[in-house]
């Protein structure tokens, strides 16, 4: 049996790299998706971290390797090697910080320089809970995404708003997963981002520019695969073997 629990079918693994300036809450997005939690005391990473998580789609199960990169200028030289073999890039900015939005152009250019023009890229405006401090409008984000031919979504990691939808959208665009776009298990009708409800977390969908339709997941999948998490500092080896819990199931990370 494969790691994903599908008889005879090996678990397909995809590398997603998160990019953006320091303090745009890239780590918070990953933590919200991986653990469904938010840590107000979380410190900025130094170097590169990664977590793994399985996703249960209509077409099967996939493994996501979520690479969290540091946004500090002095650590930029570490990042290109992790972009090169990625299946997708998530470029994050803070809607309350216009400079972080402006810098996303450079991040997207870096991705295409290292990975090529066919890489999947999603532009994410985070921290919509701070609407009173907003410096970048939804329309500006949509225009930039359209001009750069990338997908766009706004999120709120603190409350979980649109975080699942972000990963569903990325998963639907991954190689071999295109058919999952037509096999949704949930209603993915659009949400207007201009007036998010502070007291609720929408699971219905997202309002975004995108050349593709969305993919969905069951809200409570049978997570039989043991997810692995590894924290990595500056001295990161190019290849690791991670063993999952007591099953000693090898998962190769590159």
Curated annotation (Swiss-Prot):
Keyword terms: Cytoplasm, Cytoskeleton, GTP-binding, Hydrolase, Magnesium, Metal-binding, Nucleotide-binding, Nucleus, Phosphoprotein
Modified residues (O-AMP-tyrosine): 82
Major enzyme class: hydrolase
InterPro entries assigned: P-loop_NTPase, Rab, Small_GTP-bd, Small_GTPase
Reactions this protein catalyses: GTP + H2O = GDP + phosphate + H(+)
Motif (Switch 1): 32-50
Domain of life: Eukaryota
Positions of GTP binding: 23-28, 39-40, 42, 71, 126-127, 129, 157-158
Region (Required for centrosome localization): 1-174
GO cellular component: centrosome; ciliary basal body; cytosol; endomembrane system; Golgi apparatus; nucleoplasm
Entry's EC annotation: 3.6.5.2
GO MF, one example: GTPase activity
Domain note: Switch 1, switch 2 and the interswitch regions are characteristic of Rab GTPases and mediate the interactions with Rab downstream effectors. The switch regions undergo conformational changes upon nucleotide binding which drives interaction with specific sets of effector proteins, with most effectors only binding to GTP-bound Rab.
Miscellaneous comment as given in the Swiss-Prot or TrEMBL entry: Primate-specific retrogene derived from isoform 2 of RAB6A transcript. Previously reported to exhibit GTP-binding affinity comparable to that of RAB6A. In contrast concludes that RAB6C is an inefficient GTP-binding.
Protein name per its UniProtKB record: Ras-related protein Rab-6C
Species in which this protein is naturally found: Homo sapiens
Name of the encoding gene: RAB6C
């Amino acid at each position: 049996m494969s790691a994903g629990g599908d008889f005879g079918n090996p678990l397909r693994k995809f590398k997603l790299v998160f990019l953006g300036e320091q303090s745009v809450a890239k780590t918070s997005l990953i933590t919200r998706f991986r653990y469904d939690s938010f840590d107000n005391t979380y410190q900025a990473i130094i170097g590169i971290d990664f977590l793994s998580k399985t996703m249960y789609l209509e077409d099967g199960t996939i493994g996501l390797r979520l690479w969290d990169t540091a946004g500090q200028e002095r650590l930029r030289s570490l990042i290109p090697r992790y972009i090169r073999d990625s299946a997708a890039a998530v470029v994050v900015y803070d809607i309350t910080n216009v400079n972080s939005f402006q810098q996303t152009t450079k991040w997207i250019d870096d991705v295409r320089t290292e990975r090529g023009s066919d890489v999947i890229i999603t532009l994410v405006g985070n921290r919509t809970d701070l609407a009173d401090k907003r410096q970048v409008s939804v329309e500006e984000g949509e225009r930039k995404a359209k001009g750069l031919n990338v997908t766009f979504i706004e999120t709120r990691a603190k409350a979980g708003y649109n975080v699942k939808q972000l990963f569903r959208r990325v998963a639907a665009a991954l190689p071999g997963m295109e058919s999952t776009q037509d096999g949704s298990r949930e209603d993915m009708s659009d949400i207007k981002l201009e007036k998010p409800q502070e007291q609720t977390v929408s699971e219905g969908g997202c309002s975004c520019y995108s050349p593709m339709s969305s993919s969905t997941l069951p809200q409570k999948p049978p997570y039989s695969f043991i997810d692995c998490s590894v924290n990595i500092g500056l001295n990161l080896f190019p290849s690791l073997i991670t063993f999952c819990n007591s099953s000693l199931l090898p998962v190769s990370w590159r």
